[in-house]
Amino acid sequence: HQITYLEGYLWDAPLAQESMVKAASLAKASNRQVALTLSDSFCVERHRESFKDLIGDYVDLLFSNEDEILSLCQQDETESALQIVRSFCDIVVVTRGAKGSLIATGTETLKIDAVPVNDVIDTTGAGDLFAAGFLFGFTHGYDINESGKIGSTMAAEVISHVGARP
């Protein structure tokens, strides 16, 4: 798999939106998959409809935490939000901290356990490292379940110390 990864934080600036749409369009024209991380529930609130358009038109893999996906879908329950997003996105990954993550594909939802951490020091970068681990596994031929476990392992490592670098 070749994947173009888009960062939701960049969506606030109109020029960045234009650039991200162009990158996604070029990726699709080159038979690449497109991944998007929503990054921030407040950004999702500001740009809900345009995010939905971007996801529906281009995104194959969506990464979010619970707050972000609930905001995107204007739902109160994660499962109901997953049902909505899975109708227009192939793979939806929702990180849930100590509760692990959910990965929705088509009609299946996988639950990935969080890797236990003795002392959580700093959660900065946990979602980013989860996405990096998942994408590493996915692009190296691992199935979605194993890719989720790699993501969980990466997230556990980064929260065990100060700072976002492993």
What are the functions of these language-model segments?
Residues 25-29, 49, 74-166:
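Conserved phosphate-binding/catalytic region of the ribokinase-like
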